[in-house]
């Protein structure tokens, strides 16, 4: 009897361990949103990471900047600009933000693409997503 139960218990424990590491069940799962998904509503759970990736052109002065506050629902964890392709003036870049869902509620992230010295009134593009955090 013990020889039969041991493999089953081992299989059950390994299955539980794998499921606990699954990003679908993990509280800190990362949800990535791109420019194409702008305007959508996104559902998050407290602890989830929201990663926003927006394309730009290096050397032009244009940046994606956050327009609307999202506190206390999200916490900004990081913001970075990554080079895409060959490093040349004007070559594509990707601006990437990582936010952590901090508490339940609803908020919206709005961003505008403009040169900071010209102001948001001269924005050439906009991005936004509505968030529902459970």
Roles of regions detected by a PLM:
Residues 102-107:
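Glycine-centered tight-turn and secondary-structure capping sites
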Residues 122-132:
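C-terminal edge beta-strand
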């Amino acid at each position: 009897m013990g020889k039969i139960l041991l493999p089953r218990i081992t299989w059950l424990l390994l299955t539980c361990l794998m499921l606990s590491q699954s990003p679908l069940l993990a509280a800190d799962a990362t949800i990535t949103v791109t420019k194409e998904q702008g305007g959508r509503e996104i559902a998050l759970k407290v602890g989830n990471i929201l990663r926003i990736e927006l394309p730009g052109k290096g050397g032009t002065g244009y940046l994606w900047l956050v327009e609307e506050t999202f506190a206390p629902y999200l916490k900004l964890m990081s913001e970075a600009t990554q080079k895409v392709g060959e490093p040349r003036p004007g070559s594509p870049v990707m601006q990437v933000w990582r936010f952590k869902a901090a508490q339940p509620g609803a908020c919206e992230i709005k961003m505008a693409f403009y040169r900071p010295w010209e102001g948001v009134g001269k924005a050439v593009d906009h991005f936004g997503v509505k968030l529902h955090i459970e």
